């Protein structure tokens, strides 16, 4: 078992900096909300509405670029670091195209928002926020490419360091643009958008400097030569990345739409649902970090032609995530009301959120299996299955069952928010099972899904 122990240690070493980086990212969102909220509730709402538009768009591009990391890891495992740089350039071109797409989409935000009958003040502040943040889109997506290179060579520390850089820029930038200092007018929630764009540029520049001068990147020499766009590679990578982008989009859109569908049931229900969901999202960072580490390690060992060790990595990753999920689920059940009180002191909200937390605890178990299994499949370059599995599980099962239970008496009397959570648990459990079955299939049949060197190669 020494082997499993070693793999578990390596996974934790890789996952920990990724986890801390995610915590800093979540902290930034939290700080934005609080600092805008100190101006007024409308400013806080503007940041929330603006985020619900730009986040799905930028995550879509991030999903597209997630396909690169296991490939970088594959080249690293094969001792072929010089193949990473030309591939990263193609990633950067794709990122720029995607980033421009996001900017165009955000520039057309008034068209979308005009259909949402917002109060004039909220509408104007939201547009202001979006007009600021859209200038950060190219920096955000280019940073993802550099981050992928670093994580691809099994070096996740910069991700964490740059996370702290972002946090360090975020607070003073918010202070200046939200409240107005150093001759800059107070812009309220709208200033948050400019501050966030500055954070993205600071993170990109810091990462580029880190990679240029740190000895870890000497063999990679990321900026030593220039590569022209190679459309064949870009097309192949888009084919590999698009299913991940779509899978991410299905997930994000599902949660956004559930929140909208719960709105008619009143503020208490929506608030309770948001509390359970937000807490789940925080807990989700644990298995997500392990999933990212698993995809890096599997790519690395496949590059070394050690499919046997890749299988060990997947198994250890799943066991690690499940044992963590069991611990967090038990803590969630024990402290569910205390957790709800951290968010809101309204007794009605606390009681409802507390009961949803019981469901969130169950949800954590399925969630951890599905995210690690999906990470493992990315390592095997099998991304297409993610598209079908998430579409079927989240929308086919999760959404349809959730809606039926929440709003109709078709199966049981209408359950409201609990109905959607039952649907979510069913959908995630389905995804976890299907991802696991697919993973076993690929390992058993040793299908080395190598899209870059031509199509499927059987070992």
Swiss-Prot record:
InterPro entries: MATE_fam (IPR002528), MATE_MdtK (IPR050222), MdtK-like (IPR048279). Its main location: membrane. CDD domains: MATE_NorM_like. Keywords: Antiport, Cell inner membrane, Cell membrane, Ion transport, Membrane, Transmembrane, Transmembrane helix, Transport. GO terms for cellular component: membrane; plasma membrane. It is found in: Cell inner membrane. It is a multi-pass membrane protein. GO terms for biological process: monoatomic ion transport; response to antibiotic. It comes from the Bacteria. The chain crosses the membrane at residues 12-31, 46-68, 89-111, 121-143, 155-177, 187-209, 244-266, 281-303, 316-335, 350-372, 385-407, 417-439. One of its GO terms (molecular function) is xenobiotic transmembrane transporter activity. Belongs to the multi antimicrobial extrusion (MATE) (TC 2.A.66.1) family. PANTHER family: FMN_FAD EXPORTER YEEO-RELATED, MULTIDRUG RESISTANCE PROTEIN NORM-RELATED. Multidrug efflux pump. This is Probable multidrug resistance protein NorM. The gene is norM.
